[in-house]
């Protein structure tokens, strides 16, 4: 029998000299011979291992053999180390683990091959005979030593017995078999040792499927199906590996021929183009040669090609239910869906070889989960892959013909945003590259502490975008191969010995693509001066993305003199307040004075905080609409709380009103805050700092910087609106409309029926919104056209150009599409909203009479402006009439007037009930000005809709309503609360429920409707339909609150809840896990919420804080739904900018502004 002891007791790492020095890996001084204490991890099948690499057997067994005792003795010398440094933070590590590396890498003395994709040193060639026993034995014993050294408690007898058993097995059979636990240990260690993997922090969580007993390709397929089902896990991806039988003589291999278990086909078309994934062209043709029938689509999943026991391969179609795919969409660009992109959720590498203890497993498919850039950069943007970069750039309106415009960078970022958004929307596991890089740095530090090294390939670990703004970029790394290890293999079809020559694929000449031969390292090292600057944290919370945009603009401003960091509130740790120097907050207010969704967590933690020891400086800017009574409420709450905690306010809080020039207000506040910060921080050279042009742009109008040129391009309204607003705009046509109010009412509420016969691909869910792009009134447009000077013909298409910053050339302005001035004023420009301060200041330049110019300048002051705006609420035409000496050019209008925004309406129909129609419920808005003495003003969209004739086009798009949708479980009870046009989405709810009952056999749970209006004979919208739904059992209860019944007290929806439904509401919410929906005016929603909280607090004996937490949980569980809108009538806005309570605060408002 061969002697194993010379391999077991080899202690080659004792050969180096030792000197006393600081242990940099653990950052503490240690006495000579001290070893790091091991970390523990979960045990593998009832026995625990160290996180450490193999250590000597511990001294827990008495009377060890002398030679074995030497193995455990404290080493008299410390291994030589390689020092590696992180150039970002200065931290250094000492790598000693590389002394256990196996073999040499690809580098030569005069040339580095580190950028070679598949170097020979990382590739295992096929064998035609078994590994000789004298080569296998030392590797086997070394692995057994490694395995038993990983236990927390030594198992000396078991260890020695296993060594003898392996030795005897090799001597008898020429090979040996791993135990199940050894296989699990080996696969995890191989992942831990993989230098090109950035996600190794999860190495200990790998699920191992032992498939070494299978013998046929069909059995292999069944194992892989099990693997796919487990790993996909409905989107909650789990890392897993399936290990097929080990290699014997190289002639009976079990292999998966696919590069990945799931991959899309690539078809070489007759004209030389490629349809699908170009990376799969060769393999796809192989599948076709084996008998697979191609589908010739862009995203066809290729079959699995499996080889068992060295036999010719067989192919198997993967069942569609095992292929989880994610359709791509963008959170802002609706047109991104038109690209019709998708990607599979599971990245499962299938063609690598596992080497462990001299054994080779050529079939071992494994998976983790995606890092976003793998799809968004490599799969979608690489020129040799789907290569969508230029198309996306063009759709974004970027200058794709100029490299210096950085269009590629901007486009690739948005593609990656789309990938992350799409995966997250579908609840599929994915990690962004910044988080992945951060997690690797934590893993690397842990590895150096636990085992003195971490093999890492810098070229592979630095993400393909973001470069030096990821921490791995600045980290020196040492690359080497340990055992166990995952090796590359030569493609199976290139080396397979065919038994049936008729099945051998014909050899084809493969066209070689142009390969990228070098990796360009861009970006400078981080400037050392940043470390000496004052740190500034900028937090934002947002629902629409506007606060984030402004926060990042603020970061750009403060980066001129400070060290800013911009974070979303849900990414911020409250404990960091104790370390802040300067904190800036930019946030919107959502709903009824609440925080945006991504600010809820911080709000709750901050408001529970009692005190701060760090008295930092802060400033807050709030965004909102003064049409809401809780204008900028969340920003004010944060301001007051920080002040209460003892923080020092740097500048007064700022407010940005969506109805009154929020961008100008933000710029003024930002510059004021920046100057104050420079003063308090004593910034050197603060008077010479050049701040971004955004904050220094001239507020004056210079007509020489703009010009109009004739254009021959006809206007495509849908395409133009799609590009301007980043929406997928389509055309519906008016079918009919009827007034839902009775003849005795002096108000109008329309049921608008739109035909979607020309847009049959239209899809929406009950509760979602229809965004409508209206046209301005013809009288307003004509009145402005009559007062314009220096104008082309009203119907002549033109486009706008602006002078470059240096004044040397003209640049096409893409703010508006090529169109006539008449078209611009009708469809693209807002001519009804009162002009902002900034626009009035520019108009003052154009007044030819001194008195008018002086009056306009006075109106730029906030107090005068607010009084004038609230009294007159002037349209742009009325401004021209009030100041007749104004000489306004077409260039001024096209460049300075604000963009006309879409109006949103809840869809009042079910797609299943009316597949060819979309219904809206629209209150036609008419209101007086100048305290009733001025002209009547009309809502833009509601008036436009009311004037349409049958078959007139309506440009629109569908907007998701978030969580405002029917429960996924139809057995959950619902209470629907919607006065006035707040009934709109609930009509779609009851139509959908009626359809499900009739056609799907579903019996939904109790649905209770609480409606409110003035009188039953005046404005009870959809009254007959409600009665029908009640009689058919769709609505189990209908309660109506009438607020204008003669001789009776006013009753509102909250009164119904308090007086008639208190017990039912509590039972539904607290016991039956039901859903409650509120739709309508923000003041009504506030009163309803207050009533509900009072009822719950009284019934459950909760404190004010407890009941707030109770409703916070309801919203978190997506069981309390709100779809609310602000005040509609401008005269209801107070001078201080907040919406006031009208004489009847509960009068139903129009659903959807104007």
From Swiss-Prot:
Its cofactor is heme b; FAD; FMN; (6R)-L-erythro-5,6,7,8-tetrahydrobiopterin. FMN binds at residues 542-544, 546-547, 588-589, 625, 632, 658. Regulated by calcium/calmodulin. One of its GO terms (biological process) is peptidyl-cysteine S-nitrosylation. This is Nitric oxide synthase, inducible. Binds 1 FAD. Zn(2+) binds at residues 107, 112. It comes from Canis lupus familiaris. FAD binds at residues 769, 903, 905-906, 921, 923, 927, 940-942. The lineage of its organism: Eukaryota, Metazoa, Chordata, Craniata, Vertebrata.
